[in-house]
């Protein structure tokens, strides 16, 4: 994504961003390249890379990244759960995955289900529903199927 595209995106009334890092773009697709966002979801290594902070508490990393940039942020942390930040308030919810088979796409599932809710939902709701979507996704090998609304609702009711 180019700098011009990011600038145009940042003019949108509500911007949700999932700036992923992988082996082909490490260091070149950082969340810090976005001047602003309303909602960010990144994983713990992506947060630390963007903040250039390997050692401090994840809350300090999130505070540093959100400063004047984003009011709502989630940092996913695999089997450790997810951390949420909303205007100075931090929250952590544990992971709820029972039998992980393949972690590919768990963050995508988290972001896809929570981005439409981020404008009006609470950080607790975002973490709860996002963790549930991620937990369901890690039970699916590869991209054989998507997380369905029915499966998500059933999972949340059961937990």
Predicted region positions:
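Ribokinase/PfkB-type carbohydrate-kinase core domain
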Residues: 1-103, 118-123, 127-132, 139-159
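Short basic (Lys/Arg) and small-residue
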Residues: 107
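Flexible, glycine-rich loop/tail regions that form catalytic "lids" or insertion modules at the edges
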Residues: 113-114
């Amino acid at each position: 994504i180019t700098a011009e595209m990011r600038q145009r995106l940042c003019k949108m009334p509500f911007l949700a961003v999932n700036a992923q890092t992988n082996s082909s773009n490490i260091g070149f697709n950082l969340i810090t390249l976005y001047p602003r966002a309303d909602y960010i979801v990144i994983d713990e290594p992506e947060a630390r890379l963007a903040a250039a902070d390997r050692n401090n508490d994840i809350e300090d990393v999130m505070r540093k990244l959100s400063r004047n940039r984003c009011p709502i942020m989630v940092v996913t942390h695999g089997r450790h759960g997810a951390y949420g930040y909303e205007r100075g308030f931090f929250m952590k919810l544990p992971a709820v995955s029972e039998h992980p088979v393949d972690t590919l796409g768990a963050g995508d599932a988290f972001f896809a289900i929570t981005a439409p809710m981020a404008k009006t939902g609470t950080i607790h709701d975002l973490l709860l529903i996002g963790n549930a979507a991620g937990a369901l996704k890690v039970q699916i090998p590869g991209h054989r199927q998507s997380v369905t609304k029915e499966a998500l609702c059933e999972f949340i009711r059961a937990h």
